[in-house]
Design a protein with these regions (language model features):
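Juxtamembrane helix-loop junctions of ABC transporter transmembrane domains
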Residues: 10-18, 41-42, 49-62, 83-130, ...
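An intracellular "coupling" helix at the cytosolic face of ABC transporter transmembrane type-1 domains
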Residues: 26, 34, 122-123, 139-148, ...
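Helix-loop junctions and hydrophobic alpha-helical segments within the transmembrane domains
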Residues: 113, 117, 226, 327, ...
Length: 615
């Protein structure tokens, strides 16, 4: 029922406002103001030192050489070497400071993104491919690194150098300075054209990268299916098409980029040649010295370089803007209600007390605040749950049965507040769960999913999941559900490192570990979503023995595929198209000879499959 996000959602971003994004990016720089200040000072020193070679050159040509003063030549050369060494030291300090600045900002931004991701509602992850989100936290953040390391601070240094050279050029010869400035409008116009063209291309590049990452993540995760159905050639062709689109976007940006610098170089070269031609008559007339011309040519080259560098910095800014749009779009996604940090932790229910769970006329459909795609076939067709009501008291077990899509797992998801109902209420000990902080709600719940997820780490860590449990408490939890026997057979026991998603253990062993994980926190409410569907009969019997002890005093809601596992439930709800069609104990429902009885006898082999038509 999930409506996947369009792969073209990446292109649906609105027009960016550079000033707005730049101001927001600056908030990440503010905590490191001292580093920025130090880097700017170093850059100013470096810029000032660039003025020394032209002036020293003029001194040698106009004074030392005509006078034949070898000592002055040596002194000037020594000063030039000293200026260059100092400039190199300043460049080293600038690189070090901006590198530290960039890495610290990247560290802060990645941490913020990951913390925000963990607080987003489950429907958000239904809509967004994993690969796209990974791109946000990795590639997009990394693209901002150059902005902070060689963009912002270096841009300030370029501005200072440009201002200093502008003033010095006027002081050296104001007529030649005016001639040098005439090419500036052409440089600015070319830079504006480049800026407008390259921004579109960089946004396209970032979108293409996100699509490639999403495609790779999905295909790698489903590689067994790809190989099983011999889809390698088809998937390779699809990947080639995605990669070709990325290549084309890159080539367009390279084409624009390749045009820009030659045009700037032509403009500056023509300007320098014009300066030399214009200076020749004045030198011949004796109103301008050769040393002044040589110094001015050096100053002019240094004047044009910051202009070119500033445009290059703007290129860096364009890449950063394309990435920051996506990063801030993610950060602006509203978090799930009730996920704010709880400063005062409410005492959790004692497991032996259980809790009372009550559904009051609950209606739910995906798409309305549930965050999934809407079904346009009509208002009644989209309801996954229709007026579901029940109550489960401490120590009782409620079993949910029905065909696929009947709404069983949705009830579990609503209880965990992965989604919110559109109508009705869900109460926990008489308290609407929407008024409870999510952390408080989930502290009382032990949840075993049908699709078990184990993290790449040791067995004990997967059972503990960060909870302050001793090794002995972890072992006790495993022993109570029969997982200890399985764990002891692993090469390193509780220290055995599991592969990604628990790939180094079987499906049945993963389910046993998930039972231990759920029980380790001693929950008051157990939610079991077809928890024994992937284990064999022997393991299932062992788990059932453990569960019968663990359920004592606890409230349990179990989604069951094997009806034989819930015959002892306090009450069984039979769901059909989101409605409660039958309810009662196992014996009462069998006696009624309705849907439940037909399902049960079918599983027991008493009916042919045709007998279930219409169920």
């Amino acid at each position: 029922m999930t409506a996947p996000a369009s792969p073209h959602d990446e292109d649906a971003l609105g027009k960016a406002f550079d000033a707005r994004l730049a101001r927001r990016l600056f908030t990440y720089v503010r905590p490191y103001g001292r580093i920025v200040l130090a880097a700017v000072v170093v850059l100013m020193v470096e810029g000032a030192l660039q003025l020394a070679p032209p002036l020293l050159t003029r001194r040698v040509i106009d004074v030392a050489i005509p006078a034949g003063d070898a000592a002055l030549v040596r002194t000037t050369a020594l000063l030039l070497v000293l200026a260059l060494v100092t400039q190199i030291a300043a460049a080293y300090a600038e690189t070090l400071l901006t590198g530290i600045l960039g890495q610290r900002i990247m560290h802060d931004l990645r941490r913020q993104l990951f913390a925000h991701l963990q607080r987003l509602p489950v429907p958000f992850f239904d809509r967004n491919p994993v690969g796209r989100l990974v791109t946000r936290v990795t590639s997009d953040v990394e693209s901002l690194n150059e902005l902070f390391t060689s963009g912002v601070v270096a841009g300030l240094g370029d501005l200072f150098t440009l201002l200093a050279i502008t003033v010095l050029m006027v002081m050296v010869d104001w007529r030649m300075a005016i001639a040098a400035y005439l090419v500036v409008p052409g440089i600015l116009y070319t830079s504006r054209w480049f800026r407008l063209r390259v921004r579109t291309e960089y946004r396209e590049i970032r979108a293409r990268i996100a699509r490639i990452n999403a495609f790779l993540q999905e295909r790698i995760a489903g590689m067994r299916v790809v190989q099983l159905f011999s889809r390698e050639s088809d998937e390779a062709a699809r990947f080639a098409a995605l990669d070709r689109a990325h290549l084309d976007a890159h080539l367009r940006s390279v084409t624009v980029y390749a045009l820009y610098f030659p045009i700037i170089e032509i403009l500056t070269s023509v300007a320098l040649a014009s300066l030399i031609v214009a200076a020749a008559p004045r030198v011949e007339a004796g109103t301008l010295t050769v040393g002044t011309v040589a110094a001015f040519i050096q100053l002019a080259r240094r004047f044009y370089q910051p202009l070119q560098d500033l445009s290059d910095k703007y290129n860096t800014l364009q890449q950063a803007m394309a990435s920051s749009e996506r990063i801030f779009t993610l950060l602006d996604t509203p978090v799930a209600d009730g996920t704010a940090t709880v400063t005062a932790v409410a005492p959790r229910h004692a497991a032996t007390q259980g809790v009372t769970v009550e559904f009051e006329e609950v209606w739910f459909r995906y798409g309305d605040e549930g965050g999934r795609g809407k079904d346009e076939s009509g208002p009644e067709a989209v309801w996954v749950l229709r007026g579901v009501s029940f109550i489960v008291r401490p120590g009782e077990t409620l079993a949910l049965v029905g065909h696929t899509g009947a709404g069983k797992t949705t009830i579990i998801s609503l209880l965990l507040r992965f989604y919110e109902p559109q109508r009705g209420r869900i109460l926990l000990d008489g308290r609407d769960i929407r008024s409870m902080p999510v952390e408080e709600l989930r502290r009382v719940v032990g949840y075993v999913q049908q699709d078990i997820f184990l993290f790449a780490g040791d067995v004990a860590g997967n059972i503990r999941l960060g909870a302050p449990l001793t090794d002995e408490e972890v072992r006790q939890a495993a022993a109570r559900v029969g997982a200890d026997r399985v764990i002891q057979r692993l090469p390193a026991g509780y220290g055995h490192v599991l592969g990604e998603r628990g790939a180094s253990v079987s499906v049945g062993e993963r389910q046993l570990l998930s039972f231990a994980r759920a029980i380790a926190a001693d929950p008051a409410l157990l939610l079991l979503d077809e928890a024994t569907s992937a284990v064999d009969s022997e393991v299932e019997a062992e788990i059932q023995r453990g569960l019968s002890i663990l359920m004592q005093g606890r409230t349990t809601i179990a989604v069951a595929h094997r009806l034989s596992t819930i015959t002892g439930a306090t009450e069984i709800l039979v769901l059909h198209h989101g409605e409660v069609r039958e309810r009662g104990t196992h014996r009462a429902l069998l006696a009624r000879s309705g849907l439940y009885a037909r399902l049960f006898r079918l599983q027991a082999g008493e009916l042919e499959s045709t007998a279930t038509a219409g169920v």
